[in-house]
Design a protein with these regions (language model features):
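Acidic, contiguous N-terminal accessory segments
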Residues: 7-10, 113-203, 209-212
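Long, hydrophobic alpha/beta structural blocks
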Residues: 209, 226-244, 248, 268, ...
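A domain-level signal for caspase-like cysteine endopeptidase catalytic cores
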Residues: 318-504
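Long, continuous compositionally biased terminal/linker segments
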Residues: 233-281
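Long, charged/polar, low-complexity intrinsically disordered N-terminal extensions
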Residues: 1-122
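Structural motif
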Residues: 203-207, 457-461, 486-489, 508-510, ...
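Catalytic cores of nucleophile-dependent amide-cleaving enzymes
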Residues: 503-588
Length: 711
């Protein structure tokens, strides 16, 4: 069992140990108790462990919100100071180190102090306590031979992390992190990784090009993956073909099933008004579908032609290209955990200089130059005529060039918002994902909200304008930033800066084939033996990819780098945009996506490492981008795109704080409101600082408040 519950040895209460999260906490009772095993079905929500004790009260050593439901699951109230009369209750306490639920029949009262939360019954009674691991880290590591047929057994266990097989697993909190996979001589499965019998089978030929594209399906469907041909998904009495166009049909099955689960789950624990449920043109019996076993439900989902469903589906968030090679097997659990659409490209298209792909003229020796303004310069050190000053004009023509052995690849376009690449080569317009960065995500855990450290390094006087980004970090309520701005660092000072425990490094300066330019000499991270404490970074300098990749290999989670020379003015603009987005809680990949909408030069940048890295949590949880436009006299159109972010993954519910819409939406759906009064829009814009596109240009919500005042 992943959770142990034991009596406290020196006090009245229980100690709870979560072996998945490696956490332990205590809760206290008004008398010594002996926990007795209880059925997990005694609770309204799924739990990993359940015990019954006799007590007159429960206390936890933290301030929490207590949610009370009736015996049938109807939500009655939530808060930290209330009382309810005699009745049968299901009570949830949040936050807690695990999900914590109580079931009992008694009048009770909730109270809090500045350090504790208490639930007191009128008289001692049996209380059944349920615990569910937050499961943000894997339950263990599966060892397996890496040939495709052997690997199928490991992929079949990815769904063991699911907390339920009901449609509620479309909530990210009910999808645990899949177990890790690593090469081994034979299959070894940790005791805590227990298979889930969903009744779903995925049949594919034993080849990487067929196995990799179904890993997200295997996880979300808790499916057994078996060798066979033709490719298909099947359950008792039904079969869904995955050919022709195998990868496309696999992606469609994931999107369709997930969408239907989000609609069907309104029949369960959370009967909310869901916009997508209210507007669907599909005449399905969602209540009946909700009650079906997973395999039967999935069969009925997939019996609906995709062409009928497609117009209602939101744009999916992420596609990951995973080269069909054995060395990439260890990244599969991370890709599946993000519910990414997966492709397995067997061939790679090399990116050539001069193509319309972001490399332009900047690859290799500078024989030609992109046009620059008379007072413009690039962020690499290169020869230049006096009329166009450059940084480090003493350099040879090779300076600023990416190493000759660097292979740039041009992945096929995607229909999703974001794109990641796993395998050899430097992808254009995609996140270069790496295994070490994903492992650091697990080590980092949840983003801490106490203090966020940002280091801005500006190593060139001509770039001081971007150094002012320091003023953009810390523009947040409830989150405290420690911001350090440093100029003109020496090589040794730069080494010390990179080794410091910093949440985000914003580097402004020169990078070339010799490394990062310092005041005395260069620091080449690819050759240096140095410790890196920086968690995330933006290296806003010419062709900084290799230095950024070295940062990730040496300790960082991820960062934004350039593939080409970058002109100073647009680089400054992009740096300021990224600063504000990271400050607002966006992750690296989504921040760069938004920046690319504003600046065409954004395509000269990519993310290396873990694109899901954030430095602080968005106040809204999810990352939100708005679009506004004039609708009619005195009113506005408002569109909101919500992106998954950290623990607020795909399937998260969100709701706009406007009276024009009472409906809930799920990530990654878009909310579109046609006629919002100026006063209402003004109130919404004032809630928090958000990126807003108005007349196809990026603004910030606080900057647009005067617009609504003019109406």
């Amino acid at each position: 069992m992943s959770i142990d519950i034991d009596p406290l040895p020196d006090a009245a209460g229980l100690t709870v140990t979560d072996h998945i999260e490696n956490t332990q906490f205590e809760l206290y009772t008004d008398r010594p108790v002996e926990p007795a095993a209880a059925p997990e079905t005694a609770h309204y929500f799924p739990v990993d462990a359940s015990v019954t004790v006799e007590t007159g009260g429960i206390e936890i050593p933290r301030v929490a919100v207590v949610e009370a439901r009736s015996g049938d699951g109807t939500l009655l109230t939530r808060g930290d100071d209330y009382a309810l009369p005699a009745g049968e209750y299901h009570v949830g306490i949040d936050p807690a180190p695990t999900k914590l639920y109580l079931s009992f029949s008694s009048p009770f009262a909730v109270s809090t102090t500045d350090r504790t939360t208490r639930i007191d019954l009128d008289a001692p009674a049996e209380v059944t306590l349920g615990f569910r691991s937050l499961h943000q880290v894997p339950a263990g590591t599966i060892e397996t031979p890496t040939d495709p047929e052997s690997l199928m057994d490991a992929v079949s266990l990815l769904g063991s992390a699911l907390q339920t097989t009901s449609p509620e697993r479309s909530f990210p909190t009910l999808r645990g992190h899949p177990p890790l996979i690593e090469p081994g001589e034979r299959l070894r499965v940790p005791d805590r990784v227990e298979p889930t019998d969903s009744g779903v089978r995925i049949v594919v030929p034993p080849e990487y090009r067929y196995l990799y594209p179904v890993v997200s399906l295997a996880y979300y469907f808790a499916a057994e993956v078996v060798p066979g041909d033709p490719p298909r998904i099947e359950g008792d009495g039904w079969t869904h073909a995955l050919e022709p166009d195998f990868e496309r049909r696999a992606a469609e099955a994931l999107r369709q099933a997930f969408h239907f689960d989000c609609l069907a789950r309104t029949e369960g624990f959370y009967p909310v008004d869901l916009h997508e449920r209210e507007t669907t043109a599909l005449d399905l019996d969602w209540g009946r579908l909700y009650d079906l076993p997973l395999a039967t439900r999935l069969g009925e989902y997939l019996a609906v032609p995709f062409e009928r469903v497609e117009p209602e589906l939101p744009q999916w968030t992420l596609t990951t290209d995973v080269r069909p090679e054995p060395e990439n097997v260890e990244l599969l659990p991370f890709v599946a955990g993000e519910l990414s659409i997966v492709r397995a490209p067997e061939t790679v298209t090399p990116a050539t200089a001069g193509a319309d792909n972001g490399l332009g003229f900047f690859r290799g020796p500078r024989t030609e130059a992109a046009p620059l303004g008379p007072n413009e310069f690039v962020r690499g050190a290169t020869e230049a005529p006096p009329a166009a000053p450059t940084r480090g004009a003493d350099a040879s023509g090779e300076r600023g060039a990416v190493a000759a052995d660097t292979e740039f690849v041009q992945p096929e376009p995607v229909d999703t918002v974001e794109h990641a690449w796993v395998g050899a080569g430097v992808p254009l317009d995609a996140n270069k994902a790496t295994l070490d960065a994903y492992h650091r995500r697990l080590e980092a855990g949840a983003v801490e909200q106490s203090r966020i450290s940002v280091l801005v390094v500006c190593n060139d006087e001509q770039m001081r304008a971007e150094g002012e980004v320091a003023d953009l970090y810390g523009l947040r309520d409830m989150v405290q930033f420690d911001i350090d701005v440093r100029h003109d660092l020496t090589r040794e000072e730069m080494r010390e800066a990179l080794a410091s425990d910093v949440d985000f490094l914003h580097y402004i300066g020169h990078v070339d084939d010799r490394g990062m330019q310092c005041t005395d000499e260069y620091l080449d991270l690819t050759n240096e033996d140095l410790a890196v404490g920086v968690s995330a970074f933006l290296l806003n300098a010419c062709q900084s990819y290799q230095q950024g990749e070295a940062l990730v290999h040496r300790g960082s989670r991820g960062g934004i780098v350039t593939l080409t020379d970058v002109a100073n003015s647009p680089a400054t603009q992009l740096g300021r945009i990224i600063a504000r987005l990271m400050n607002s809680g966006f992750n690296l990949r989504t921040a760069l996506h938004v920046a690319k909408r504003e600046l065409i030069t954004g395509h000269q940048y990519i993310v290396v490492g873990d694109g899901g890295t954030t430095i602080c949590q968005s106040r809204s949880g999810v990352a939100v981008v708005g679009n506004i436009g004039e609708s009619s006299s005195g009113s506005w159109s408002l569109g909101v795109q919500a992106y998954p972010n950290g623990p607020y993954g795909v399937g998260t519910l969100y709701k706009l704080a406007t009276s024009s819409s009472d409906a809930n939406y799920f990530v990654p759906s878009t909310c579109e409101l046609k006629s919002v009064p100026s006063t209402e829009l003004s109130d919404w814009l004032g809630l928090e600082t958000l990126p807003i596109f108005y007349r196809d240009e990026l603004h910030w919500s606080d900057e647009l408040l005067p617009l609504t005042d003019q109406e």
